[in-house]
Amino acid sequence: MEYGFTGLNNSRQSAVDQERMSIVASHMYEQYNNYQNANLIANGIFDSIYDNMKILTDYFRQTFSARGIPSDDIYCLQDDVTKSLLMSIMWHKIGFTMIFNDKPQVLENSVKSQRTIYSRIVATKGDCIKAINENPDSLTEKIRNMEVASLYVPAQRSMPCELRTIHLINEIHPVSISIENANKEFLLKVIEYVCGGGYVHWQSTYL
């Protein structure tokens, strides 16, 4: 007796089974194509973010130097291994990474069709390159705790990107941004969010 899909092309295999698997194959083929297209568009946005990051880094270096403040801690870099960017503005570290784009993924609760495949660029408060290298076994959890916003990039250029920012009260606020403006708007908003705030002294509990 044969079990499973042994002899799938055998004449005994029903046409119904083949039709069902054909639907699955077509679905996966469509997802794969959309995944490739979304990543292609996202890679272009990612490269443009780095180009704008270098321009802004020069601006901040000049601005602080003109005020007599050392600018050694103002720089940016790209890491191809982790698919990440890092921008340092004095004591603030801002990261962008595409490391999670390893398979086709839809966007939950998207205003668009649930079938739409998106690529994702995650923005972090803190050095995402260091976090990725030091936490290979708990990568998703670590980056999730550092995330301040994510840009979701669709597979079709006619569709807008969706920018989701995480506010201090942990509410997610989605905003639609055109693909043409996504790189600059995403970078500026993240810098405003991270550097426009600050840090709080930790406090001990005294008895």
What are these regions (language model features)?
Residues 1-22:
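Charged, low-complexity intrinsically disordered tails and linkers
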Residues 15-75:
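Contiguous, amphipathic alpha-helical segments that mediate oligomerization or scaffolding
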Residues 70-86:
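Beta-rich nucleic-acid/ligand-interaction surfaces
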Residues 82-207:
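Intrinsic disorder/low-complexity polar-acidic segments
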